[in-house]
């Protein structure tokens, strides 16, 4: 089963232009959905993504990508 990433294009702490390419680099075959994830509170302060329906957040995008890499199915 392929991995799935869901990210918000409206949250202040998430830079979609840099995050999407890095997620695709982590798993080129993953399904990616972009849109509101109703995660506005944490999304205001931390970079976040849903990975296989699990929310992951971190103070920086670099830290988030490290968490994502640990959670994706190989």
Swiss-Prot record:
Positions in coiled-coil regions: none
Family per similarity comment: Belongs to the UPF0741 family.
Domain of life, source organism: Bacteria
Pfam families per record: DUF1450
Protein name: UPF0741 protein RBAM_034720
Signal peptide start-end: none
UniProt source species: Bacillus velezensis (strain DSM 23117 / BGSC 10A6 / LMG 26770 / FZB42) (Bacillus amyloliquefaciens subsp. plantarum)
């Amino acid at each position: 089963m392929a991995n799935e990433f869901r990210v918000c294009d409206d949250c202040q702490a998430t830079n979609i232009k840099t995050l999407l390419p890095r997620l695709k680099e982590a798993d080129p075959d993953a399904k990616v959905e972009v849109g509101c994830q109703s995660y506005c509170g944490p999304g205001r302060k931390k970079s976040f993504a849903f990975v296989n329906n699990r929310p992951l957040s971190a103070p920086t995008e670099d830290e988030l990508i490290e968490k994502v890499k640990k959670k994706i199915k190989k």
